[in-house]
Amino acid sequence: MMNNSNLVFKAIGFDADDTLWNNETFFQETQSKFRKILQEYPLDEIDQKLLNIEKHNLQVYGYGIKGFILSLIETSIEISDQQINGKQIGNILDLGKKCFSNQFIYLKMLKQLCGIFIKNTFYY
């Protein structure tokens, strides 16, 4: 068993999205708009196909907006049996561009939390 009393941390990192600001809302809004682009296909099939493709693509693209948008495009191609048109793909790309321009809303108590860490940090 390890003795934790000798542990010294040089840095603490935060995975910022959904930890320091609300990011998930943007993904949900984008997915809702994506469903409208593919409204001629069954909603439950779209959602399930997207979820499966996103999970598979995590190994390739990782997390984030770019991987999400590429997964939306791949989903649209598969769900439409390659019948999706260029205008619809363009609309999906526009959704992605909008994701990058969203203003983040910092989660409550962020300033207080950062202040606590700064106040209790020891510099060597």
Please annotate each region the language model reported.
Residues E40, D44, H56-K98:
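A metal-dependent, Asp-based hydrolase signature
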Residues M2-L51:
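Active-site neighborhood of HAD-like aspartate-dependent phosphohydrolases
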